[in-house]
Amino acid sequence: MEEKQNNKSLQTQLYYWGNTPTEQDYYNLQGIKSTKSFFTSPRNLTLFTRSWLPSAKTPPRGIIFMVHGYGNDISWTFQATPIQLAKNGFACFALDLEGHGQSQGLKAYVPNVDFVIDDCLSFYNFVLTQNPEFQDLPKFLYGESMGGAICLLIHLKSPSMFNGAILIAPMCKISDKVRPRWPIPQFLTILAKFAPTLAIVPTADLLDKSVKVPEKKIIGGMNPNRYVGKPRLGTVLELLRVTDYVSSKLCDVNLPFLILHGSADVVTDPEVSRELYQLAKSKDKTLKIYEGMMHSLLFGETDENVEIVRSDILAWLNDRC
């Protein structure tokens, strides 16, 4: 009985609305508005989307387009960040990427990141078209892990659209600590030509390597939309291709950015974040490396550490709005 009660308590924490009857009641108590819907991309893919907006009494000071990481989605732990940002005056929008969350596609299969970039840009332009009052507001990208790499690719494809980017442990290069060793990559490359959706790539559990607090590992594992299988061959090869490309284009990055990374991150490499900071053309650039923190900075750390990271994000945004 006690174990069931603990599990129920964890589930309640995860949905962020405590003892309030519904999710919408929780948003009301937080003083924000939230919507969810489906968006059809130009390639006719059905993608699940959410928004988190300041209350009607508080006109937004800026727009943030958010991108989640590999195997994650926008409806579970991810939304704690846009909720806080909306409470501080920022209109936040996000979609579940292809093969993730409630969007169409084989689970955790991303055959071509270039198509994902087009999906994101199409959705962001749709949001701006439907909300002309947002046109003159500062527009920011926000990406976690794989989402950080996608934000950089979005910027490289549309360099004048955004006023800045917040990159949380960006996957500019897959860490050698989780990258498959020779001769596995060579063998998998050959096999992927015949069976790209095969989920057999040997890697450690990313949840275990990302989240520091044991209780939060339980919460993260309860996500019904979380992908728990091994990475698919085609996805891994595509992420290797994309991160190799991004790491070769760091010197072309030319927008204001904030990079936040944990020194103890073994999923994405903080050294590559340092390299991005050093090589980027951007005149307005900030790098913060948090000593001892792991990959999941905005959920998996202690509440005190999460608040430090949130405060740094808000301070950076406030200075630019």
Language-model segments: which ranges?
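Short beta-strand/loop motif that positions the catalytic acidic residue
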Residues: 253, 259-261, 265
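The serine-hydrolase catalytic nucleophile loop
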Residues: 70-83
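Conserved alpha/beta-hydrolase
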Residues: 82-105
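An N-terminal hydrophobic leader/cap segment in hydrolases
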Residues: 1-55, 202-209
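Alpha/beta-hydrolase-fold enzymes
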Residues: 144-232
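Catalytic active-site module of serine/aspartate enzymes centered on a nucleophile-bearing elbow/loop
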Residues: 291-321
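Catalytic nucleophile-loop/oxyanion-hole region of alpha/beta-hydrolase
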Residues: 74-76, 101-138, 304-308
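Short alpha-helix in the alpha/beta-hydrolase fold that links the catalytic acid
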Residues: 255, 269-278
